[in-house]
Amino acid sequence: MKVTAATRSRARHFAMQAIYQWQMNGNPLHVIEAEFHTDNDMSKVDTEYFHELFHGVAADKSALDACFLPHLKSLPLEKLDPVTLALLRQATFELKNRVDVPYKVVINEAVNLAKKFGAEDSHKFVNGVLDKVAADLRALEFNAARS
């Protein structure tokens, strides 16, 4: 399948849902991933990207959390809405590991998912936190875009 912006967006959509499910029930990754492939039409999804995001977040959860934790304004991780937490982890993974994807694209995709699935106004919180994470992880790209 040809990788497009749309297939990547769908991959992020399903990966965020898979991460959410993993956070909530702790089922093995392969079980959750198999359910997604069985229960959803994945024909228009970049399934390799879905797999990379889902497994990458699970494998690097603590390091990802450490990237955005300083920007939560003293809010403990446990108090975050689970959808917001899944989005922050997924987007931070992309910012950290997929430098081929512009940071603005990563943030915009996360904000759009927060508008669709998150609590009211969570998209503003997600945008603010990820903007700071991008400044930390992608300083050159971030500063070049700001000048």
Swiss-Prot record:
Cite a single Pfam family from the UniProt record.
Answer: NusB
Give the record's GO biological process terms.
Answer: DNA-templated transcription termination; transcription antitermination
- What InterPro entries does UniProt report for this protein, alphabetically? NusB-like_sf (IPR035926), NusB_fam (IPR011605), NusB_RsmB_TIM44 (IPR006027)
| Record keyword Transcription regulation present | yes
Record keywords: RNA-binding, Transcription, Transcription antitermination, Transcription regulation
One GO MF term: RNA binding
Q: Looking at the UniProt record for this protein, which Gene Ontology cellular component terms does it annotate, in alphabetical order?
A: cytosol
Q: Which domain of life is it from?
A: Bacteria
What is the stated purpose of this protein? Involved in transcription antitermination. Required for transcription of ribosomal RNA (rRNA) genes. Binds specifically to the boxA antiterminator sequence of the ribosomal RNA (rrn) operons.
Q: What's this protein's family per the entry?
A: Belongs to the NusB family.
- Family matches, as NCBIfam families: nusB
Question: Entry's HAMAP family?
Answer: NusB (MF_00073)
Task: Return the protein name.
Answer: Transcription antitermination protein NusB
Organism, scientific name: Teredinibacter turnerae (strain ATCC 39867 / T7901)
